[in-house]
Amino acid sequence: MSTNPDNVPSLLLQAHNQADAEQYDTANGILKAIFKINPNHAASWALQAALHTVRNEPDKAKSARASGLKYWKTNPLVDHEIGKKLSSKYLFAEGAAHQRQALEFSKDYLQAKTQLAQDLLRLGQEEEGWRLAEEAHKADGYDVTTYNLLTLHDSLKKYTTIDRNGFLLRMTPDEAALYGDEAIDLLTEARELFSAKYDTQIEGPVIVEIFPEKKDFAVRTFGIPGGDG
């Protein structure tokens, strides 16, 4: 930035970092600076649309998305980037919808297919999620995220599944025998407590996976092992 303060990729990275830290006003300020340099930068408009969605400003989000698609109406990058940012804010259903739109624009857009696979797995739509992960891996066997996910999928096949009280609890056979029933009882108690506290009902089975190693949890959550700190 000291060499070229108008470098858009560097500015956009700063905007993303500020958004990740929930410094939305600062992120918006950086985006305004970008639009003064390049008012048609699609990826920046995608981030702008995502930030408006996070702040519950649907009309502004729609307008920002339209600006990102102004000169390429079917650019899959725009919806992919919007959805990716929304998913990073735990808005997985909204993020998945944008990935589906990106794939409608370009059915072979692997970034969207990989992200959609992860979103669906987080939403409990496992059959489609694992299928998309396999499709993405077949298209790019060197992609780290899908390789890690499918390796974990093979491990999960060896787990014991306890299906009771609206929960699907997956854990290793040894741990399931040791405290599986107690875990289901605790989950049931927690659901009743928080359903009453927040006056809501959880629809569909809740999938809970207990991993013996932290790296497996990291792969399931982030697509890559790690997570120290």
Model-derived segments and their meaning:
Residues 5, 39, 73, 107, ...:
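Short coil turns that delineate tetratricopeptide repeat
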Residues 118-144, 151:
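TPR/TPR-like (Sel1-like) alpha-helical repeat modules
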Residues 1-2, 32-36, 66-70, 100-104, ...:
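Conserved structural position within tetratricopeptide repeats
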Residues 20-33, 54-67, 89-101, 123-132:
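Structural signature of tandem alpha-helical TPR/SEL1-like repeats
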